[in-house]
Amino acid sequence: MLEKTKELSSTVKLVNNKLHFMGSVDNNEPVSIDYISPLGDDLGYTSLELLLLSLSSCIGSSVLTFLRRMNKTISSCEIKSRGFRKEEHPTGFRKIEVNILLGSGDLTDEDVRKVIALSEDKYCPVYSMIKASTEVIISHYIQRN
């Protein structure tokens, strides 16, 4: 169980003469981070792409955890996200759309809405950190099996 007081630390190291970094947290696998041409070489994820992945996986983790605690059978889960950037600097996201695609034979829309609300309100720290500055719209679709 993750301790609430656990301190996380990361390291990013420059690997070329542009903006290509290798980053890691603790003993996890490194991730390649770069910037778009001409400043970078497109050799890895951009920082905003990593933010989208972090948000999607954070929401997905909390949603799946609560659905499983409700004894729901989940045969598949795919989360697609799209970020819409601001025109002015800093050109971070002004809006992010997250679509959760779930495969299940016993899941209801109400079940999913309930756990999404829990994720938004309390259990997804990435969402909690960005919600004040970025509109986040979460939708879902259930594929019946």
Predicted regions and their residues:
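Extended beta-strand/beta-hairpin segments
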Residues: 1-53, 65-145
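Heme-based O2/NO sensor domains and their adjacent alpha-helical segments
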Residues: 62
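Alpha-helical metal-binding/catalytic segments enriched in His/Glu/Asp
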Residues: 55-59
